[in-house]
């Protein structure tokens, strides 16, 4: 297998890197696999202050295909007052709201768009009602690739205004977010559009992992005992 090959999470069948996210044999999800023994903490010393400093742990083969808007290496702030109230001596808050489009979604979107560029895809998109739409549109604009945002027709315009400001096209879908997601998946498969949170998902999720890498590095490679992750 080549660098950063895919492997089925269920049956362990392996695939070369491709525009694929579901196993042909058992329909399980495909994950990216790496040559971990070839890297250590010294690998990342004195590198750029973006999440692309972890290039060896990301699924891009050629650095020329990186689409970066300088996201990542966000502050890890020690919350002393809150920690004291909770009886915790070492409580930290990772502030990803300072990323270029104001959320952690810049991480997965950036990796997915970079892989779409590496695959030579001519257009990208996502099913989203907010932050992911903005992140996908911003990276697509940087890459010079057309971008399509699939969202319910009754969505508040303000929620996708940022994405539209980057030049993305809004595809209005009658129905719920789930319906928008289904339509996006169908168009992605039929037209060869890289839908970052659907048919590019194997690569998309790799970007989110960089937040964890940063936390470890910012703590001098000491992993935290507990993590609290807000969800919406």
Predicted regions and their residues:
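PLP-dependent amino-acid enzyme catalytic core
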Residues: 1-232
């Amino acid at each position: 297998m080549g660098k950063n090959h895919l492997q089925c999470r269920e049956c362990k069948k392996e695939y070369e890197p491709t525009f694929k996210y579901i196993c042909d044999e058992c329909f399980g999800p495909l994950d990216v696999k790496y040559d971990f023994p070839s890297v250590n903490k010294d690998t990342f010393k004195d590198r750029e202050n973006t999440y692309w400093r972890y290039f060896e742990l990301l699924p891009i083969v050629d650095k020329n295909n990186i689409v970066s808007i300088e996201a990542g290496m966000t502050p890890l702030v020690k919350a002393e007052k809150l920690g004291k109230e909770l009886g915790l001596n070492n409580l930290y808050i990772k502030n990803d709201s300072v990323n270029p489009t104001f959320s952690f979604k810049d991480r997965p979107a950036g990796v997915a768009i970079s892989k779409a560029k590496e695959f030579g895809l001519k257009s990208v998109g996502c099913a989203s009602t907010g932050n992911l739409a903005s992140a996908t549109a911003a990276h697509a604009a940087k890459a010079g690739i057309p971008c399509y945002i699939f969202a319910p027709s009754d969505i508040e315009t303000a929620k996708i205004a940022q994405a539209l400001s980057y030049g993305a096209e809004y595809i209005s879908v009658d129905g719920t977010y789930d319906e928008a997601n289904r339509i996006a998946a169908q168009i992605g498969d039929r037209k060869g559009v890289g839908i970052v949170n659907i048919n590019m998902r194997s690569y998309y999720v790799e970007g989110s992992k960089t937040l964890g890498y940063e936390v470890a590095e910012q703590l001098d490679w000491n992993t935290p005992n507990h993590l609290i992750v807000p969800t919406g």
